[in-house]
């Protein structure tokens, strides 16, 4: 900018150059540019700064609890650890911007390259080398490691080797002890065979190859995986727990390593002690030159965590063959004749799948030798193996029956299916193993699944890094892996032991329970889709089912409905019954009247005019609801209705869960802790009918959007008719009773059920208007406030009156994502955290989605709704 003088012409200001030495530039004087040191600095007796390019390290990004980056110039980042203000950043204006011939097209390409560079192999950056992948590179920095990100070392290998030589207090093999726990390690069995050590499941002492890092050696309080800092701090532990469990689940061909729960408490046998002595010296010698092994282990562990965190948020394309449900159904009904075991097989007890990918931990079930004296004539006849059920197995089964099964339903039930159907079949598996030496793959899968659910539930009750938390976590990983292997065998291979339909169905549904408890819901969609095809194949072969089977169908139907409400992008063409056609131009209004009785439109929202009844669809085995147009007092549970109102979509089954019993007897007046089996999920039948029809409407609407089809007129009219039913709905359940003071709730449980029902109803209104009508959330804040009030009232009953009720997270999630008020958002956040403490699972995925919706809405970013986040993260949501 020019400077004007009073008397003379304007003088042009000197242009600033950026070619001088750093000292002259700092003094803002002209530099003579002499190399290697300028003459002006020498004359001034100043050290010349030279002409080299100066780079400055950028500070790591920090995020607030909502995942929003904190600006570098904020007070939280402008001071260093010593309290002084950091120097300003230099700008390299004398260096041209880099221009590449090839630019990135997708962010995923850049993320993949940066992920590889984040954990470089040691040989790529050794000897001051720089590893470059296309546009980015990495080199080795300081040797000082930040200990908060490094895995904790529990013991020194040299000390272990010396102690092995001096005493026999530490075992190198798996012991038949009830205090051992299994953790997976890769490629161990082959190494042991090659070196001649086949007795144990642990790496031999003189094997110099580093094992896969221990899954649980990390300090969970300080762990921060690069690239996933946006995960909320309150949910990071649960996310990492899911990643750890996923790591244990996806390890292929693993051989468990037995680790003692109580250190220094094992006693080794003489043979094991000799083996330890033989290999102790070699073990110590190998450690002399293995200083890089801990770094490799940490690097490998970081990479595993990143890979599995990526699996949590992105789709996992499996290369395994999909099972054929029809072939399995044929096998179920063909192999119904009694089996007989040859005498040669009586000594064999099958506790693990034959593929050796997993095994039953010896701390629960163990094979022992029969030591009783027998007559010589019976030595070759009587089996020589026994099955010992340790106290840990009984403890886990007892914990499941008393503490976990009741939380699978919204309210405590007198006849809980998880106690009357699931649990007895797990005990049958134990009986088969003890009596016959083997059980069906489905029962084995169910037994391991129930034990895994108990372990995951128990580990959530202990603080992070606590010994028992790691113990039950590792045990649950192994049991979940084994349950998955048994189920895979059940679905893909034919066994000599016949499978029963209810056994297979409970095994598949139990895997869904594990996914909810252990935190990730990635496999729920696959398990429910498999279950759907399996049930349909069964109904084609034999449509008549028992009451127990119908109960399992009800459980599946409701879980599938909950899953379908969020997995809208997974809609299948067979679900669509209303397609656009040429008849739309001449379309007449849909006649919803009942042709068999009268021409008046049925008012299904008025309970005095009829009864909502359960009906079984013989084509796909799902449960749907019929509205019987007769007074409740004149209709018995088993009578044939004279007129019915079918679901809104007559060609598909509207899923529900309900029993054929009088609605007026739903809430027991005498016992406030026990509710009838009609109310597994604490919702009236008419509300589930509305929920099912609403989900079908939303899925139809999404199918039209995905396939670029015009919306049929018939569908628009059906939607309007449903909207009227939704807004006029009234519950058929009687929550109140008349007394001298007016109306009051029957009991505390009835009051809690009322709040649960109304919170779900108002959330259903929010779900319909946001997903089917694309209404802005600002117009629904009245319903959001009502949902929050009912949830808080229900929570108050649980805390003060000890009402046994575990609400669904569905209504809180839908209302929370639609909430725009920051104070109410914090209330929803607190409610979800409280539900995670009292319920079965942590629901960290749904809670993180809710936080992301609020962040986008606050920053005025596009896609500030749960469905956009669901699609962006490719994350499955199971809100049961």
From Swiss-Prot:
Residues 21-48 bind DNA. The keyword Membrane does not apply. Keywords: Activator, Arginine metabolism, Cytoplasm, DNA-binding, Metal-binding, Nucleus, Transcription, Transcription regulation, Zinc. The keyword Disulfide bond does not apply. It is found in: Cytoplasm; Nucleus. One of its GO terms (cellular component) is nucleus. Coiled coil: none annotated. GO terms for biological process: arginine metabolic process; positive regulation of transcription by RNA polymerase II; regulation of arginine metabolic process. InterPro entries: Fun_TF (IPR021858), OAF3 (IPR050675), Zn2-C6_fun-type_DNA-bd_sf (IPR036864), Zn2Cys6_DnaBD (IPR001138). GO terms for molecular function: DNA binding; DNA-binding transcription factor activity, RNA polymerase II-specific; transcription coregulator activity; zinc ion binding. With ARG80, ARG82 and MCM1, coordinates the expression of arginine anabolic and catabolic genes in response to arginine. Interacts with ARG80 and MCM1. This is Arginine metabolism regulation protein II. The gene is ARG81.
